[in-house]
Amino acid sequence: MLLGALEAGGTKMVMGLADGDGNILKQASCPTRLPEETLGDILAFFQGEKIDALGIATFGPVDLRADSPTFGNITNTPKLAWRNFPLYARLKDALGVPCAIDTDVNGAVLAEAELGAGEGLKNCVYFTVGTGIGGGVLSGGQLVHGLIHPEWGHVIMNRHPEDPLQRGVCPYHEHCVEGYACGPAMQARWAMPAQELPDDHRGWALEAHYLAQLCVDAMMTVSPERIVLGGGVMHHEALYPMVRQAVTSMLGGYLASPVLSDMDSYIVAPRLYPDSGLVGAALLAKQALAQ
């Protein structure tokens, strides 16, 4: 079994080949340019290989309603050239193999729950914190969709009273978590990128405040057995204990569970990073083949 995997990102595309267990055998990447140019690069990678199926874990929003005539299309993305682009249909038609598509963060949570930091769990959340913020949910062993798919980055937050930003940087919402806690928000707030902030900078406590709100919202709604925090901003490892401490404080003793007595094991880093999304795409391909 040879599985094709595509992690379609707003900045770059990562293509991979994997075996039936999700092990990545080969990978390459290309910049995300105009759709037709980028599609040519993707197909050049896969058409020389005899893949049995393709899994696509993509940036969004993406139409995931199985009965929709635009299933698999990128929808109202800020990347204007990609709006309404039929990514799934174009790749499926060109490669002629079974295909599956989901969000990049749903791909990541699938991978981490099956093979990574949430291995063996049926209820898990994965949040990525970088240029944007997104989240994938595995509930009862199934990826969560619905009206569209979860848009965790745009959950509305309470602004910290000491935040220098009066509103977040999101063009759609004044007070969503992406607007306050993504990499560009940190740049706008402190006039320097997150990776340049000193370890003792108060910006990290502010970041933990917003990410803790996000985690608590998830705990109160989808009740995950583990929360995985990934993405470029989380490279600052000291952020993890700060988020855990803030979550404990915000919970106020609510949600009595022995699991929460060990926050170090509850809110964790991804084990498969930076390949969580690519491995997830391979697992989506395996599902497509099984159907």
Give names to the regions the model predicted:
Residues 11-12, 107, 131-134:
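Conserved A3 ("GATE") glycine/threonine-rich loop of ANL adenylate-forming enzymes
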Residues 99-103:
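General beta-strand structural signal in soluble alpha/beta enzymes
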